[in-house]
């Protein structure tokens, strides 16, 4: 609804029966006058997981665009010895993009180092369905591209964070440690300290690893109203906030005299 109460758009979802219960199948979006503007349909594989999202035309007859949700990892050569391995814990990475060819950490057989701790498989593809299965977000790919731009000599270990079970964070940190990563980028956070207990325990046990975490963008003082893991207070956590082009705190960025360590340009 608009501020004046006028209907601006409408969205309908249909969830279909599946062996594990109802699962999202199709969404139809319409304008304020109830005309269909597009449809979105999820395609499932034999394992019951969504493998593609199809965007449909207004009459729902044609597929306008098809987005893969869990494609195979392309083959690649083993990682060169001595390359700095940076773990990016986020929503995954779109490893099918040419941008990342040769920049993802791999073992001696060419297998991708990294893991999907959300779906618990070896395909950490960038899909965040937390808000809607029909409108997934792709935060991790953007973050990873920035890391590679700023650190051209690094290779990436992509991880998809364990939203269904945050206790898996302990296993994820251990996985990154075994894979040879001592730098971990985590542009994420939440208000619930309990969500981060497994991470805190694993990080504290590994002082040789540095975890670079975002302060967040809620426009608040973390010393008074904390966000985690930024406010965990571990010696091997570096909490970073954003500056604008003039070197001032960027609009909406969090701050904190004791909780935030560094402010860097982050608006461009």
Question: Which residues does each predicted region cover?
Answer:
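Protease zymogen maturation seam
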Residues: 5-87, 91, 97-99
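Extracellular/periplasmic catalytic domains that process cell-envelope and extracellular macromolecules
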Residues: 78-81, 149-151, 177-178, 204-206, ...
């Amino acid at each position: 609804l608009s501020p004046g109460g006028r209907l601006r758009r409408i969205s309908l979802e249909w969830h279909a029966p599946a062996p594990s219960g109802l699962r999202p199948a199709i969404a139809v979006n319409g304008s304020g006058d109830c005309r269909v503007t597009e449809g979105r349909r999820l395609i499932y594989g034999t394992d019951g997981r969504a493998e593609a999202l199809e965007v449909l035309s207004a009459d729902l007859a044609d597929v306008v665009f098809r987005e893969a949700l869990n494609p195979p990892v392309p083959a690649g050569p083993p990682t060169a010895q001595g390359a700095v391995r940076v773990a990016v814990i986020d929503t995954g990475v779109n490893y099918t993009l040419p941008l990342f060819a040769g920049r993802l950490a791999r073992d001696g057989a060419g297998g991708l180092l990294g893991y999907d701790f959300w779906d618990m498989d070896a395909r950490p593809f960038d899909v965040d369905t937390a808000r809607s299965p029909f409108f997934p977000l792709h935060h991790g790919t953007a973050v990873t591209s920035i890391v590679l731009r700023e650190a051209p000599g690094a290779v990436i270990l992509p991880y998809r964070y364990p939203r269904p079970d945050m206790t898996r964070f302990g296993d994820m940190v251990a996985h990154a440690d075994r894979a040879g990563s001592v730098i971990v980028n985590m542009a994420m956070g939440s208000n619930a300290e309990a969500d981060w207990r497994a991470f805190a325990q694993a990080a504290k046990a590994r002082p040789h690893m540095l975890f670079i975490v975002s302060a967040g963008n809620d426009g608040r003082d973390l010393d008074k109203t904390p966000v985690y893991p930024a406010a965990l207070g571990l010696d091997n956590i570096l909490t970073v906030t954003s500056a604008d082009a003039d070197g001032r705190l960027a609009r909406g960025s969090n701050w904190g005299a004791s909780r935030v360590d560094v402010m860097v340009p982050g608006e461009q």
